[in-house]
A protein has these predicted regions:
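Twin-arginine (Tat) signal peptide motif
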Residues: 1-7, 30-31
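A generic alpha-helix preference that emphasizes hydrophobic side chains
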Residues: 3-4, 23, 128, 254
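N-terminal export signals
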Residues: 5-26
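Alpha/propeptide regions of enzymes that mature by internal proteolysis
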Residues: 10-11, 15-16, 31-331
Length: 331
């Protein structure tokens, strides 16, 4: 679609802000999903996140409804999951790597296009906050391993052993039967990726994760890599990913989605195309999961995944909802 047509459509959308939500069918080139996703009625602010992270989106919404900026909402929301011991894929109490160490990745991106990230960081509960400090307090974009941990401590963060007794026991059991192979399946992906637009219409995003369960030491997925796990362009919108990070990295998925939206695709269409890029290039796509979420400047959202079971949490107009994503492979 030509840019002038995209602008025209965006203008028409703006004229009907409070009328009806836009309905977008989940459709691929060769088949149509029976589900349909209703994009958000373009009323701001709005926050969306991967999976059923309702507590996280609620915390983010509480910032937004008070007139707070989207970047603050993102940090507040992600911190909720990082501190939750019941969430074994993020922050404190997360599943360790194959050597028994909990290593965390996180990234955050602001309306200005500034970016901060940490990878392979240990002993710090809130990597999303450290990532923001990297963005705001250093000339760098990404810090890794011990360097990231040392920087966090210099910024006032306290060290803490993140490996719980429960996760240590599970790791020890895994070692006996696994032959040191990481668990790779369509369920082993609970990264939280979050996108928010504040009342000023400015968008920010963040991602936080412990990565693939029992991964090789030093493994870095897509979550902290700009353009893969997260990308924001305040003139267009944003996108985030969850799932098999290696596949997202190879297709630079979040950047692809934002660029497709820039060219006129809806968030839903862009997410579907990003998934299609993966399944057409990897014949083993039935053995792993990838899911995308996108949000444009008009407040319209979309999501799509390879396998059913993925969805997004949305908070808007004081209401929390869960929207099941369409999928390439029908259950």
């Amino acid at each position: 679609m030509k840019r002038r047509n995209f602008i025209k459509r965006a203008s028409l959308t703006g004229l009907g802000l409070a009328v009806v939500p836009t309905i977008i069918s989940c459709e691929t080139e060769d088949k149509k999903d029976k589900k349909a996703i209703a994009t958000a009625t373009p009323v701001l602010p709005i926050v969306v996140a991967t999976w059923r992270f309702h507590n996280a989106t609620k915390a983010a919404w509480e910032v937004l409804e008070k007139g707070g900026e989207s970047i603050d909402a993102i940090e507040a929301g992600c911190r909720i999951e990082e501190a939750d011991l019941k969430n074994t894929t993020v922050g404190n109490g997360a599943t360790p790597d194959r050597d028994g160490n909990v290593t965390l990745d996180a990234s955050i991106m602001s309306k200005e296009g500034d970016y901060g990230a940490v990878v392979c960081m240990e002993n710090i509960v809130h990597p999303i906050s450290v990532a923001r400090k990297v963005m705001e307090e250093t000339p760098h974009v990404l810090l890794a391993g011990k360097g990231a941990e040392q920087f966090a401590v210099s910024q006032g963060f306290k060290r803490k052993n993140l490996l719980t007794k429960e996760r240590k026991k599970a790791w020890e059991e895994w070692k006996v039967k696994s032959e040191y192979k990481p668990i790779i399946n369509i369920e082993n992906h609970d990264t939280i990726g979050m996108l928010a637009i504040d009342k000023n219409g400015d968008i920010s995003g963040g991602v936080t994760t412990s990565g693939l369960a029992y991964k090789m030491a030093g493994r870095v997925g897509d979550s902290a890599i700009i353009g893969s796990g997260l990308f924001i362009d305040n003139t267009v919108g944003g996108a985030t990913a969850t799932g098999m990070g290696e596949e997202v990295l190879k297709t630079v998925g979040s950047f692809l989605i934002v660029e497709l939206m820039r060219q006129g695709s809806t968030p839903q269409e862009a997410c579907e195309e990003a998934v299609k890029r993966i399944v057409t290039s990897n014949p083993n796509y039935k053995n792993f999961q990838v899911g995308y979420v996108a949000l444009n400047k008009q407040g319209e959202y979309g999501s799509y995944c390879i396998h059913s079971g993925f969805g997004i949490s949305k908070y808007q107009e004081g209401k929390q909802t869960y929207v099941e994503s369409g999928s390439y492979v029908e259950s």
